[in-house]
Amino acid sequence: MSRRPGNPARRFGESGSIPFAGSLHQKSRSSPFLSVGLVVVGSLLLIGYSYSGSGIPVFINFLFISLDSCGLSCTLEAQTAIPILKKAYGDSMRKVLHVGPDTCSVVSKLFKEEDVEAWGVEPYEIEDADANCRSLMRKGIVRVNDIKFPLPYREKSFNLVIVSDALDYLSPKYLNRTLPDLARVSSDGLVIFAGYPGQQRAKVAELSRFGKPAKLRSASWWIRYFVQTGLEENEAAIKKFEQAASKRSYKPSCQIFHLSAYH
């Protein structure tokens, strides 16, 4: 008994032997949603740019800070806070020294502020420096200097010293040397950005660059240490910073300490 042949056209359609037919139909249905999504993202970027005093879209800042909380450093936090620091410190930001990794980025951001001169100290060897960073190093604006040793500057060379992600990697033994030296080169004060205890860090990146994981300490630990070192919190700067931050709805993802300079 002969078998009745099936409908080849039906089998062809059911077996999905035309792989692009379904995808083309699906693409035609999803393309309006894709277009709407692109318009929404573009609008967010434009709105963020319009309302950001720093020149970096708020949306992008939010994205970067979220990444920072998931395992990156506080250096981007320091960059984001620069306009707020300018409001809080005013003329005390005429000559600024930044100390910490990726200092070229921070110095470049400081240069965009009116009436601000900036210098930077990179505590670690700079790998794959871009053209801008190489230029800053050639001009002597940025230096590579192990902060366990004295900085190559005279006393009170700068109005303000901003430190990010540099002290988190030092033991108390080296902090005893480094923190007083940072205060030595400042005439008006120090601003320290430090990670919160329990904050996630990119372990592989940390070990390859810094040689050790960060020692993330509590605010109470830092305040006790500042007192032992003879440094006092700058209450006036703290109040002005908090007021400026509130106006911009700025909520830092790192600890920020404002210290008075030695007198």
Language model features: what each stretch is:
Residues 159-173:
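A short SAM/SAH-binding and catalytic strip from SAM-dependent methyltransferases
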Residues 166, 182, 195:
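Hydrophobic adenine-recognition pocket in adenosine-nucleotide-binding enzymes
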Residues 206, 211-237, 255:
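Short alpha-helix
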Residues 3, 9, 13-95:
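Class I SAM-dependent methyltransferase Rossmann-like catalytic core
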Residues 91-150:
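Class I SAM-dependent methyltransferase SAM/SAH-binding core
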Residues 238-263:
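Core SAM-dependent methyltransferase catalytic element
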Residues 148-161:
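A short acidic, Gly/Pro-enriched loop at the edge of an enzyme's catalytic core
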Residues 186-200:
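Conserved beta-strand signature within the Rossmann-like core of class I S-adenosyl-L-methionine
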